[in-house]
Amino acid sequence: SWVSKLHGSKPGIPANVSLMYPTGNRTWGEAGTGGFIGNSHAPMGLVDKDPNARAKSMTLQGMSLDRLMDREALRASMDRLKARIDTTGQMEGLDTYNQQALEILADGNLAAALDVSQEHPSVVERYGINDPKYQRDGAPKMIRNFLVARRLVEAGARVVSLNYSRWDWHGGDGLNFPRSREEFPLLDQGLSALITDLHERGLQNDVSIVMWGEFGRTPKINKMNSRDHWPKANFAFVAGGGMNLGQVIGATDKHGNEPIERPVRFQEVFATLYHNLGIDLSSATVEDASGRPHFLVDPGIKPIRELVG
């Protein structure tokens, strides 16, 4: 949402896109909101169990562009009357949504970006096969959304978020390690395909990738042959963005208990992404509803020097 506010969007392509599927555990399936910045900068959700259906819903479906514009003119005249009696500011947000929807229908670039059938079959095959079945309270294994994310960025989206499968394995079934052997190779296939794709298309310096979760796993194995939640130490994988890659930054003790060398904060990762997007963290601010400016990260937080120094 910060990036959408500061950089704006291209006509017909939302700046902030979510390919995150709603999940039984609600927090795993949300890409956030616009907060005080406004709903017009919230992520636009573009997921559907049928990947082809989402593209079709963004085309005119037999209606001429002239007829669409006539309908838009009528709607706008009615909304102007509503806006005169609106004291909440909600109409302004709706106007932004309506304009964005109109641009999407008229432009067609978003629908084209979502249509992976336009890709060469060998490229699609590289990413693996989607499994639309929901993984208990987690997301489905829509591995080709890595490809959709690349197409969206090429079309002009600035930020794309996605979720994949389910990783909360420390319950009573004792299948933590069997699931690891199943899930990690599939994730590796989609992620490595995306990185390879970006290099082949000359985008490796223009697109930044971050893969992470909100916490790590316990050094000790519990009585159910699984590892529990562990907030003391975590990891993130980054690629692209013209960064200095091929290195491990920081270290934990020998048990993986907590950092003992170069701990990295979450906000440092965000600062690095903002830096890669050309945002000056020393001066970029966004005002809240009262006009008070907010910096994007806390004072003293800088991009990860090992990556961008």
Locations of the language-model features?
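Ligand-binding pockets and gating/stacking loops
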Residues: 1-309
